[in-house]
């Protein structure tokens, strides 16, 4: 273990000088013992000097402080002992419940599984959320992105997915809070505790008040813990909230290191950094990682380089729309924009595929007719078009659903709808079985039977 001294501090960037024959490698973890601060080597500048990024606050650092090279990248605890615990980027507990007591530690920079070891599955993962199960079904061991601007419900949707899948799936989950609000991490902890699944969830947080180096690495810390469970032959759920903050942290680090920015000010290595993370989130012949990632969309622009780069890695995309949220329809999932590789007759079956495409066709036709209705009114439409509009409005309302995690806000009990009931309900609307019911009966209900019951009460 070689030692060096701090020679320059500029915000989160710390330059350290080492003897010429003991210069640390890129990604090695260095520790300033007196400050309890860990640094990660990013560049070798020559002359024995390395440029590092601080994993914590660099307040109070000064030139001349002694720095010790650990000789390896950052290592974090893995295995059963991490379940039910909240940790930071270094795997240190922050829940005041004593040491982790881990039996093993892994380095956070690891190779992705080789092509021969990878395994893909077409087995569907039922979420209990109608709109997702119908138009963008998830695959076990797949990667899902929840795309949306500010305040359209990404975190609430993710909490509901965790609530529904973690309970029904009864597997292990790892939650990486990347650059999000501390309040959300707090809410998530108590939500898991109330649901009784806390002992099956490992939580890693790097909130938005942390330095950029911390936020850039916290996703890798969470992923390393998920990889350990996968390598033990388990099926694990890996939740990331929010992948955009990971990109943003990379942008900040890139600027601090003096790299030339690329489009919209992002780092020139955006695609590579995203690839390094996403390629590791994969299923092998031993076990599976099913990943759900929230993706913030800046200014609701899906062509922004950050969400656009993320798109390429996903199996299913759930796009949350501000227009749908403004109609009071929650979850505000856009059924015309959301996609899934699993929506194929050979995977989901012919009936599911026909109902899903039928729903999308009706909604697309309604979207086209909206301009005519706005200018000329409903009376100018043909009888067929009028029927399309009435059914599309019912479908639109029926795509809403009360959530378990939103019970405190809405006052309505949450509903879990099985895939079979979802298909039956939408098939009935498309076939005209419920043409006699008012469209309001379909709003914020679970199964179609509840809509019929609601209409009969009136």
Swiss-Prot record:
<dbReference type="GO" id="GO:0045259">
    <property type="term" value="C:proton-transporting ATP synthase complex"/>
</dbReference>
<comment type="function">
    <text>Produces ATP from ADP in the presence of a proton gradient across the membrane. The catalytic sites are hosted primarily by the beta subunits.</text>
</comment>
<dbReference type="InterPro" id="IPR004100">
    <property type="entry name" value="ATPase_F1/V1/A1_a/bsu_N"/>
</dbReference>
<keyword id="KW-0375">Hydrogen ion transport</keyword>
<dbReference type="InterPro" id="IPR003593">
    <property type="entry name" value="AAA+_ATPase"/>
</dbReference>
<dbReference type="InterPro" id="IPR050053">
    <property type="entry name" value="ATPase_alpha/beta_chains"/>
</dbReference>
<protein>
    <recommendedName>
        <fullName>ATP synthase subunit beta</fullName>
        <ecNumber>7.1.2.2</ecNumber>
    </recommendedName>
</protein>
<dbReference type="InterPro" id="IPR055190">
    <property type="entry name" value="ATP-synt_VA_C"/>
</dbReference>
<dbReference type="InterPro" id="IPR027417">
    <property type="entry name" value="P-loop_NTPase"/>
</dbReference>
<keyword id="KW-0813">Transport</keyword>
<keyword id="KW-0472">Membrane</keyword>
<dbReference type="Pfam" id="PF00006">
    <property type="entry name" value="ATP-synt_ab"/>
</dbReference>
<dbReference type="InterPro" id="IPR024034">
    <property type="entry name" value="ATPase_F1/V1_b/a_C"/>
</dbReference>
<dbReference type="GO" id="GO:0046933">
    <property type="term" value="F:proton-transporting ATP synthase activity, rotational mechanism"/>
</dbReference>
<keyword id="KW-0547">Nucleotide-binding</keyword>
<dbReference type="GO" id="GO:0016887">
    <property type="term" value="F:ATP hydrolysis activity"/>
</dbReference>
<keyword id="KW-0067">ATP-binding</keyword>
<dbReference type="Pfam" id="PF02874">
    <property type="entry name" value="ATP-synt_ab_N"/>
</dbReference>
<dbReference type="InterPro" id="IPR000194">
    <property type="entry name" value="ATPase_F1/V1/A1_a/bsu_nucl-bd"/>
</dbReference>
<dbReference type="GO" id="GO:0005524">
    <property type="term" value="F:ATP binding"/>
</dbReference>
<dbReference type="Pfam" id="PF22919">
    <property type="entry name" value="ATP-synt_VA_C"/>
</dbReference>
<dbReference type="InterPro" id="IPR036121">
    <property type="entry name" value="ATPase_F1/V1/A1_a/bsu_N_sf"/>
</dbReference>
<keyword id="KW-0997">Cell inner membrane</keyword>
<dbReference type="InterPro" id="IPR005722">
    <property type="entry name" value="ATP_synth_F1_bsu"/>
</dbReference>
<keyword id="KW-0406">Ion transport</keyword>
<dbReference type="InterPro" id="IPR020003">
    <property type="entry name" value="ATPase_a/bsu_AS"/>
</dbReference>
<keyword id="KW-1003">Cell membrane</keyword>
<comment type="similarity">
    <text>Belongs to the ATPase alpha/beta chains family.</text>
</comment>
<keyword id="KW-0066">ATP synthesis</keyword>
<comment type="subunit">
    <text>F-type ATPases have 2 components, CF(1) - the catalytic core - and CF(0) - the membrane proton channel. CF(1) has five subunits: alpha(3), beta(3), gamma(1), delta(1), epsilon(1). CF(0) has three main subunits: a(1), b(2) and c(9-12). The alpha and beta chains form an alternating ring which encloses part of the gamma chain. CF(1) is attached to CF(0) by a central stalk formed by the gamma and epsilon chains, while a peripheral stalk is formed by the delta and b chains.</text>
</comment>
<keyword id="KW-1278">Translocase</keyword>
<feature type="binding site">
    <location>
        <begin position="148"/>
        <end position="155"/>
    </location>
    <ligand>
        <name>ATP</name>
    </ligand>
</feature>
<keyword id="KW-0139">CF(1)</keyword>
<dbReference type="GO" id="GO:0005886">
    <property type="term" value="C:plasma membrane"/>
</dbReference>
């Amino acid at each position: 273990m070689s030692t060096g001294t701090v020679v320059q501090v500029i915000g989160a960037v710390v330059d350290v000088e080492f003897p010429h024959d003991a210069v640390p490698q890129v990604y090695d973890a260095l520790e300033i013992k007196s400050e309890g601060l860990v640094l990660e080597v990013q560049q070798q500048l020559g002359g024995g000097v390395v440029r590092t990024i601080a994993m914590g606050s660099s307040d109070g650092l000064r030139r001349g402080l002694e720095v010790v090279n650990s000789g390896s990248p950052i290592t974090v605890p893995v295995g059963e002992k991490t379940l039910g615990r909240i940790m930071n980027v270094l795997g240190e507990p922050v829940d005041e419940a004593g040491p982790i007591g881990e039996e093993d530690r892994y380095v956070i920079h690891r190779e992705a599984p080789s092509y021969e070891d990878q395994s893909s599955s077409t087995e569907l993962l039922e979420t209990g959320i109608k709109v997702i199960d119908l138009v963008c079904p998830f695959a076990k061991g797949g990667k899902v992105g929840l795309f949306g601007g500010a305040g359209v419900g990404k975190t609430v949707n993710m909490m509901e997915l965790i609530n529904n899948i973690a309970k029904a799936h009864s597997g292990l989950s790892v939650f990486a809070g990347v650059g999000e609000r501390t309040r959300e991490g707090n809410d998530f902890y108590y939500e898991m505790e109330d649901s009784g699944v806390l002992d099956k969830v490992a939580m890693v947080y790097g909130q938005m008040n942390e330095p950029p180096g911390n936020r850039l690495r916290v996703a890798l810390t969470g992923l390393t813990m998920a990889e350990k469970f996968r390598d033990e032959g388990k099926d694990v759920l890996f939740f990331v909230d929010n992948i955009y903050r990971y990109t943003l942290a990379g942008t900040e680090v890139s600027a601090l290191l003096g790299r030339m920015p690329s489009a919209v000010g992002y780092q020139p290595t955006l695609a590579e950094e995203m690839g390094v993370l996403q390629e590791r989130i994969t299923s092998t012949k031993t076990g599976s990682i099913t990943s759900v990632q929230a993706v913030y969309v800046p200014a609701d622009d899906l062509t922004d380089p950050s969400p656009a780069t993320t798109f390429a890695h996903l199996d299913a995309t759930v796009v949350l729309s501000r227009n749908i949220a403004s109609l009071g329809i929650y979850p505000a999932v856009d059924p015309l924009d959301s996609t899934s590789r699993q929506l194929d007759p050979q995977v989901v079956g012919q009936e599911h595929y026909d109902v899903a495409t039928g729903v999308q066709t009706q909604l697309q036709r309604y979207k086209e007719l909206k301009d005519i209705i706005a200018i000329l009114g409903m009376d100018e439409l043909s009888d067929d078009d009028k029927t399309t509009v009435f059914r599309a409005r019912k479908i639109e309302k029926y795509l809403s659903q009360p959530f378990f995690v939103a019970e405190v806000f809405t006052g309505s009990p949450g509903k879990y709808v099985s895939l079979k009931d979802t298909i039956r309900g939408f098939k009935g609307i498309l076939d005209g079985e419920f043409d006699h019911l008012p469209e309001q009966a379909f709003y914020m209900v679970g199964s179609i039977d509840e809509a019929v019951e609601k209409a009969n009460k009136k």
